[in-house]
Amino acid sequence: MKILFVEPAIFLSAFAMTLTSPLTTQYVYRRIWEETGNYTFSSDSNISECEKNKSSPIFAFQEEVQKKVSRFNLQMDISGLIPGLVSTFILLSISDHYGRKFPMILSSVGALATSVWLCLLCYFAFPFQLLIASTFIGAFCGNYTTFWGACFAYIVDQCKEHKQKTIRIAVIDFLLGLVTGLTGLSSGYFIRELGFGWSFLIIAASLAVNLIYILFFLGDPVKECSSQNVTMSCSEGFKNLFYRTYMLFKNASGKRRFLLCLLLFTTITYFFVVIGIAPIFILYELDSPLCWNEVFIGYGSALGSASFLTSFLGIWLFSYCMEDIHMAFIGIFTTMTGMVMTAFASTTLMMFLARVPFLFTIVPFSVLRSMLSKVVRSTEQGILFACIAFLETLGGVTAVSTFNGIYSATVAWYPGFTFLLSAGLLLLPAISLCVVKCTSWNEGSYELLIQEESSEDASDRAC
């Protein structure tokens, strides 16, 4: 008997993703540090390998390492851009016919292959530049954006009421926060106690268990309910894919189409800033004047991941007294405040306090996805989440590349500039949401609008 709960797969995937990101960044940082100069890291040291005295030659050396790591991250992200875009869009779009499990399985295979390669890279001390090739190959199988998009579509398929969608998506974000918080908190101890090799092996093992669960235990309601036998050539499949995307916007009324585009713009611009700035936090914390070690970086990651929990609680409480759009405003403006505080953080206490305004950072992600799902038909959910995942993949890679490039160019004269820039960019989704509000956003009215359009389409077909 198949299980219709995707939460265990999300749990394992979130653990692997959260542990992979800081481990890979710090592994590359140490490799570049050791290969650039004659300085080595002391694995049992309680302080970071960081020099605060600007007149010291080590200070100039660590600034050079920061630039090299930022540029390497840029190269690695760009290498997976094109294959990631193509695979994400195709896999999630065809999930409406072939089931949500297919993109989950393929993206899990790619993640497992990448983690195994990280183990080999670390154990045999291969050139770390080979990470670029593994990123490029792994992106063909889809990435974590593909996996999350399939999971959210899987959940929406099971939700009948609109409020249930918001709460269920918030529950998933809460689960993500719980896992990422605990994993982030322990990531520094993984490095210190087990080293990089064993840590990467644990990641590979968790992804293998995740793949087994999806293959043999997870059911697929879309595939089970689908009775049509799709037999078409590859070219016809691509044509049908893009045709369905085109019809998603064409079949909508003018007001609904405008709202759909505006909400997509809001979602992607907010995603662009939050995802783009995320890797900079670790580099910022490793550099002077903070000079954090791997344990403090783990504490910072855990505190940042607490926003998943607080965002879930916020959505759960706010949903009884305010609309979705007001919750999104709260998340955007508190995140903006956190960016400004981070830009001026010069001590450990200030950096921890700067994390406090990020408590509702995840709220706009959950709320905007829910708002988008409410303005499309139930038969268009798969293609909608394919569009979202495609834009998130494009925006995510572009954002990380852009912010890494900006940080590399500005770290020497003002490391906090990138955070001030991100705070300014958050005005874009805020303004976009104001326009949505001015169109008299009302959840119930758009539900009725969709029903009216569906009945009109049915009558047209009957004629």
From Swiss-Prot:
Keyword Transport appears in the UniProt entry: yes
Family, as annotated: Belongs to the major facilitator superfamily. SLC46A family.
Reactions accelerated catalytically: estrone 3-sulfate(out) + n H(+)(out) = estrone 3-sulfate(in) + n H(+)(in); 25-hydroxyvitamin D3 sulfate(out) + n H(+)(out) = 25-hydroxyvitamin D3 sulfate(in) + n H(+)(in); cholate(out) + n H(+)(out) = cholate(in) + n H(+)(in); glycocholate(out) + n H(+)(out) = glycocholate(in) + n H(+)(in)
Positions of short motif Tyrosine-based lysosomal-sorting motif: 446-449
Species this protein is from: Pongo abelii (Sumatran orangutan)
Membrane-topology descriptor: Multi-pass membrane protein
Compartment(s) where it occurs, according to its Swiss-Prot or TrEMBL record: Lysosome membrane
One GO term of the biological process aspect: vacuolar transmembrane transport
Residues of this chain annotated as glycosylated in UniProt: N38, N46, N53
UniProt keyword terms in alphabetical order: Glycoprotein, Lysosome, Membrane, Signal, Symport, Transmembrane, Transmembrane helix, Transport
Keyword DNA-binding: no
Any single Gene Ontology cellular-component annotation: lysosomal membrane
Name used for this protein in its record: Lysosomal proton-coupled steroid conjugate and bile acid symporter SLC46A3
N-terminal signal peptide: 1-20
Function statement: Lysosomal proton-coupled steroid conjugate and bile acid transporter. Preferentially recognizes lipophilic steroid conjugates or bile acis as endogenous substrates and seems to mediate escape from lysosomes to the cytoplasm. Modulates hepatic cytosolic copper homeostasis, maybe acting as a lysosomal copper transporter and sequestering copper ions in the lysosome. Delivers pathogen-associated molecular patterns to cytosolic pattern recognition receptors as part of the innate immune response to microbes.
Bilayer-crossing regions: 74-94, 102-124, 134-156, 171-191, 198-218, 262-282, 295-315, 325-345, 348-368, 383-403, 416-436
Lineage: superkingdom: Eukaryota
Extracellular compartment spans: 21-73, 125-133, 192-197, 283-294, 346-347, 404-415
Positions on the Cytoplasmic side per record topology: 95-101, 157-170, 219-261, 316-324, 369-382, 437-463
A Pfam match: MFS_1
GO molecular function: copper ion transmembrane transporter activity; symporter activity
